Amino acid sequence: MTNKERVAKAIRHMNTDSTPYSVHFTQPAYETMQSFCRNPDFYDTLGSYICMYEYSDFREVKPGYFQDHFGVVWNRSGADKDIGIVSNQVLSQPSLKGFVLPPIDERAIRRLIEDGFRSNPDKFNLYCIGFSMFERAWSLCGMEDLLAYMVLEPSFVHELMDQIAEYNLCLLKIALEYDVDCIHFGDDWGQQK
């Protein structure tokens, strides 16, 4: 049984000969583990059953500040060095006038997936869209403003969510040309019931 088969069986609540797992680290924790293990490639020795591919593009615009492909600038100079805190407001008004979705680097997505498949053929392949809907919307507008717009400007929120959804569908169309086993959406919304 391959690791891919073990994960698929576990998802279907079927017994497996071992318990599938996947380990991920924040960047500071990753660096701490590299130092602790005295091995820069320690992650490759963990035996994770899952490979996750995520298209993201951050560039440092000043020390500790990173801009994503939507134009959101994340302050990673404080305690949160992994994701950061939004330090700008791309959509400061409830209007999409002048707002353009970022281009999708199809070649980069294909390279990411193909390289992952080549190096991890027996693992469960997961394509991830982090900040998929609600998180992308609040990162563009600001949390408080987006929540207010949901009540005061619902047509704007619908239009914004439609554009984000269309963008994500373009990402999915590319990813689903490959034999990915799962799509992971990174929104933190839901309930415990």
Task: Indicate where each model-derived feature is located.
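Active-site loop segments of alpha/beta catalytic cores
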Residues: 1-33, 67, 100-193
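A contiguous, low-structure linker/loop signature
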Residues: 60-107, 119-124
